[in-house]
C-alpha cells in the first residue's frame, strides 16, 4: 500500500523574489535562504538576528503567566513551613523530564521533597486516587503536578479534603471547569494572556522554576543546566519549535552537546551518540524513545531515577536497563503495527474511510500511541487505536497535518468516560461495548470536517534550486536554521531534470535503498545522495532518462566537508510523463 506523494510548491512572486534579494544582501546569505526566512514569517534584519542567535535574555517574563505569583507564593510557604513536597508527573518523556527538572532545581535549596510517577497499567494517565493516598501516607502537604492534571477536578478536590494543595503545570487543552488547585499554570487557559501558547509540560515547569528563582534572587545561571531537559521534551513532545521554544531548544541542545547532565550523558552513550553533534531528530528517534520505554513497559519512575542520578556509573547501569525496555518495546511495537496493518488491509471498508478506528483486547497499552502514529504515517488518516482494560477500552488518537483530532474526539464526549490532549494527539477511555457506536460517530465527524488534501501524502517543497546553488556557504548558513521541528521544518528542496552520473547503485541488506551520484544540466557538479527505501525507482534512474528529486541537504558523514542529499521522493521529469 504505497502512497504516492503530491508535491506542493508555490514559486515566489516577482515581489517576493525582490524582497528576498534585499534581505539576503543585508544578512549576507543567499536569496534562496532569505526566501526560506520569509516563508517562516521572518522579514526584517532584526527578526533574522533573533532567529539565528536566540538569546536567553529574550525569554518571556514568567510572571505574565496566569497564577504564577500564586504558585511561587505557595512554594515559598511550603519551604518556610518545612512541608513535604511531592513532584508528580506523567509517564511520558515530557512528564519525566518535567519532574526531573523541577525536582532537581528545588532539591538544591530544599531537601524535604520526593517525586512520583503513576503506573500506566495500574493507575493510568493523570492524577490517581492511589497517588493522592500515597501522598497522604507520606505526610505530603503540597503536590506539584506536571504535564497532566488540567482535568483532574475530582482528584484535586479529594486531595484538598485531605489537606493537600496542588500546583498544576500543564499544557493540555483545559475544560470549562478548572480543578480547585492553589495555582493552575497553563498557557492554553482561556483567561491567560501569556504571549506564547505552545510550551510543553517541561517548558511550563521551567517557567515555574524561572519565576521561583527570580522571586528568591537566585541567579538565572543556575537554571542553565536544566535546559538540556527542556530540549529533550520539546523535541519528543512534538511542539512548535518557534519563539520561546526555539530559545529553549537552541540553548538546550547546546547544553546537551557541551555538558549534559549525568543521566542524559548515560543515555547519549548508550545510543552511540557520544562525540556526535546531537540534533532534534536524534532526540526524537534515539533519546526520547528510551526515556519513554520505561513508562511504556514498566514504570516511568525508572526514567526519572536516571535523569536525576548524580553518579555516572550508576547512571550507566540504569541507562542499560532502560535500553532493554526499549528493545522489548520495539519488538511489541513491530508486532502490533503488523497486526494493525493486516486489520486495515482486511477491513476494505476502512480503506475508503477518511479515518481509522481499530481495537484489539490483547494490545499492550503502552505502545498503542506509537502504533496510531505509524498508521497515520502509512495511510494518512486520523487514527484511533484502542485496547481493553476491564470493561473499558482505552486508547490513543493521532492525526494528520491540519486536522484537529481533539475536536473530533470531543464531539463524542457523551459516550466517553475520559479524554484529553491536543490538536494532533489525544487519549480517550470509553466502555468496551460502546466502541462501534464511537467508531460511527467519530468517522462521521471526520468525514464532515476533513479536507481532501489533508489525507494526501504531501511533500511541501520550500524552494526549487539547481545543484550549483548548493555551496559550502549555503550549507553552513542552512544549518543555522536549526533546531528543526514543527513550524520550522528542515527545508525541503527540489531540483528538476537531474541525471544519474552512471555510478548510482542499489544498496542495503535487502537492496532497498539507492546510493546516488547525480548531475543536472546547469553545471558539472556531481552530487551524492541517498534515497532510503526507494529502490523501486532504480530501473528508471539507470535508464539514462532525466528525473526530478525532492530532498533535504545533510552532512556527508563519510566525506568531511561534503554534503549529501537525503532524497525524499524521485519522480520522472515532467516532460517524460
Where in the sequence are the language-model features?
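Hydrophobic helix-and-loop "lid/oligomerization" segment in the mid-to-C-terminal part
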Residues: 4, 11-142, 162-163, 213-434, ...
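Mid-to-C-terminal polyanion-binding domains and interfaces
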Residues: 77-83, 314-320, 324-358, 411-577
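Short, glycine-/Ser/Thr-/acidic-enriched flexible segments
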Residues: 92, 149-151, 173, 189-190, ...
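Conserved strand-to-helix beginnings and helix N-cap segments that scaffold or border functional pockets
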Residues: 99-100, 128-129, 156, 178, ...
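Short alpha-helices
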Residues: 101, 179-218, 223-235
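Conserved beta-strand segments of alpha/beta enzyme cores
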Residues: 112-114, 165, 183, 528
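Conserved acidic residues
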Residues: 141, 182, 548
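Histidine/acidic-residue-rich, glycine-tolerant segments that coordinate divalent metal ions
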Residues: 146-199
Amino acid at each position: 500500500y504505497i502512497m504516492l506523494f503530491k508535491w506542493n510548491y508555490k514559486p515566489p512572486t516577482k515581489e517576493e523574489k525582490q524582497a528576498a534579494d534585499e534581505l539576503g544582501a543585508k544578512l549576507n546569505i543567499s536569496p534562496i535562504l532569505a526566501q526560506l526566512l520569509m516563508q517562516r514569517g521572518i522579514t526584517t534584519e532584526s527578526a533574522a538576528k533573533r532567529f539565528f542567535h536566540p538569546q536567553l535574555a529574550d525569554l518571556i517574563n514568567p510572571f505574565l503567566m496566569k497564577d504564577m505569583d500564586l504558585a511561587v507564593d505557595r512554594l515559598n510557604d511550603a519551604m518556610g513551613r518545612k512541608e513535604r513536597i511531592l513532584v508528580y508527573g506523567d509517564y511520558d518523556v515530557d512528564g519525566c523530564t518535567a519532574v526531573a527538572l523541577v525536582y532537581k532545581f528545588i532539591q538544591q535549596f530544599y531537601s524535604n521533597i520526593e517525586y512520583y510517577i503513576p503506573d500506566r497499567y495500574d493507575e493510568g494517565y493523570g492524577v490517581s486516587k492511589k497517588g493522592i493516598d500515597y501522598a497522604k501516607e507520606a505526610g505530603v502537604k503540597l503536590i506539584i503536578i506536571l504535564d497532566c492534571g488540567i482535568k483532574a477536578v475530582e482528584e484535586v478536590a479529594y486531595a484538598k479534603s485531605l489537606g493537600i494543595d496542588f500546583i498544576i503545570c500543564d499544557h493540555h487543552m483545559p475544560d470549562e471547569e478548572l480543578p480547585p488547585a492553589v495555582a493552575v499554570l497553563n498557557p492554553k487557559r482561556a483567561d491567560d494572556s501569556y504571549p506564547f501558547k505552545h510550551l510543553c509540560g517541561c517548558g511550563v515547569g521551567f517557567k515555574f522554576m524561572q519565576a521561583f528563582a527570580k522571586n528568591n534572587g537566585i541567579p538565572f545561571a543556575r537554571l542553565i543546566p536544566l535546559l538540556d531537559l527542556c530540549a529533550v521534551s520539546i523535541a519528543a513532545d512534538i511542539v512548535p519549535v518557534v519563539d520561546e521554544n526555539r530559545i529553549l531548544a537552541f540553548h538546550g541542545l547546546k547544553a546537551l552537546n557541551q555538558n549534559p547532565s549525568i543521566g542524559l550523558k548515560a543515555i547519549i552513550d548508550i545510543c552511540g551518540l557520544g562525540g556526535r553533534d546531537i540534533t532534534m531528530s536524534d532526540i526524537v528517534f534515539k533519546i526520547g524513545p528510551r526515556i519513554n520505554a520505561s513508562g511504556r513497559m514498566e514504570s516511568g519512575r525508572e526514567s526519572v531515577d536516571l535523569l536525576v542520578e548524580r553518579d555516572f556509573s550508576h547512571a550507566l547501569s540504569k541507562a542499560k536497563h532502560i535500553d532493554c525496555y526499549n528493545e522489548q518495546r520495539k519488538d511489541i511495537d513491530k508486532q502490533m503495527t503488523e497486526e494493525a496493518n493486516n486489520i486495515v488491509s482486511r477491513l476494505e471498508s476502512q480503506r475508503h474511510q477518511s479515518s481509522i478506528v481499530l481495537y484489539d483486547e490483547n494490545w499492550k497499552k503502552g505502545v498503542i500511541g506509537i502504533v496510531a502514529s505509524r498508521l497515520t504515517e502509512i495511510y494518512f488518516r486520523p487514527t484511533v487505536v484502542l485496547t481493553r482494560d476491564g470493561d473499558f477500552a482505552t486508547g490513543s488518537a493521532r492525526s494528520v497535518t491540519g486536522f484537529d483530532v481533539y475536536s473530533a474526539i470531543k464531539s463524542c464526549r457523551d459516550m466517553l468516560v475520559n479524554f484529553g490532549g491536543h490538536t494532533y494527539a489525544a487519549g480517550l477511555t470509553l466502555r468496551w461495548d460502546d466502541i462501534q457506536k464511537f467508531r460511527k460517530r467519530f468517522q462521521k465527524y471526520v468525514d464532515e470536517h476533513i479536507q481532501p488534501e489533508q489525507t494526501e501524502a504531501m511533500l511541501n517543497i520550500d524552494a526549487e534550486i539547481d545543484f550549483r546553488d548548493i555551496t559550502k556557504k549555503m550549507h553552513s548558513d542552512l544549518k543555522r536554521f536549526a533546531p528543526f521541528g514543527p513550524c520550522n521544518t528542515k527545508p525541503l528542496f527540489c531540483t528538476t531534470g537531474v541525471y544519474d552520473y552512471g555510478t548510482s547503485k542499489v544498496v542495503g541488506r535487502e537492496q532497498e535503498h539507492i546510493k546516488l551520484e547525480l548531475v543536472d544540466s546547469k553545471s558539472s557538479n556531481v552530487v551524492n545522495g541517498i534515497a532510503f527505501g526507494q529502490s523501486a525507482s532504480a530501473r528508471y534512474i539507470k535508464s539514462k532518462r532525466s528525473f526530478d528529486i525532492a530532498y533535504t541537504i545533510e552532512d556527508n558523514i563519510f566525506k568531511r566537508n561534503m554534503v549529501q542529499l537525503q532524497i525524499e521522493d524521485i519522480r520522472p521529469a515532467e516532460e517524460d510523463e
